[in-house]
Amino acid sequence: MKVELKILNKELIKELPGYATEGSAAIDLRACISESIYLKSGECKLVATGIAINIANPNYAAMILPRSGLGHKKGLVLGNGTGLIDSDYQGELMVSCFNRSQETIEIEPLMRFAQLVIVPVVQANFEIVEDFSQQSVRATGGFGHTGV
């Protein structure tokens, strides 16, 4: 599938985004910043990526996810859990970074700090009803209803 990628900051030409291996599901996003950003414990900041994408197909979206190693080893996760990029958004990709560790985290210029994956989506046709046409076995069982 073709997704247009626009380089907004020429510094990124040194480190173009791409898949690390043939089996990679996501591309790494780099911090497109001129100097290091320091995140104190519990702090959240937006970090620029220097790129924009044009998915242009409403059957797909992009998701920004944390990099596993940084989240597990350093405590660098996303401030909003997951970043959802709609197919018609064409602005710069920004990443909300949150430090869940007790130590200050440094995000260095051009550091790989998040990842982007393209996923299929379905736009549902919602029908307003008084009652559901069928009741599931679970019905209204909510949080913890199947055990902890």
Curated annotation (Swiss-Prot):
Its EC number is 3.6.1.23. One of its GO terms (molecular function) is magnesium ion binding. It comes from the Bacteria. Pathway: Pyrimidine metabolism; dUMP biosynthesis; dUMP from dCTP (dUTP route): step 2/2. Transmembrane segments: none annotated. One of its GO terms (biological process) is dUTP catabolic process. It catalyses: dUTP + H2O = dUMP + diphosphate + H(+). Pfam families: dUTPase (PF00692). InterPro entries: dUTPase (IPR008181), dUTPase-like (IPR029054), dUTPase-like_sf (IPR036157), dUTPase_trimeric (IPR033704). Substrate binds at R67, S68, G69, N80, L84, I85, D86, M94. Its cofactor is Mg(2+). Keywords: Hydrolase, Magnesium, Metal-binding, Nucleotide metabolism. This enzyme is involved in nucleotide metabolism: it produces dUMP, the immediate precursor of thymidine nucleotides and it decreases the intracellular concentration of dUTP so that uracil cannot be incorporated into DNA. Belongs to the dUTPase family. This is Deoxyuridine 5'-triphosphate nucleotidohydrolase. It comes from Francisella tularensis subsp. tularensis (strain SCHU S4 / Schu 4).
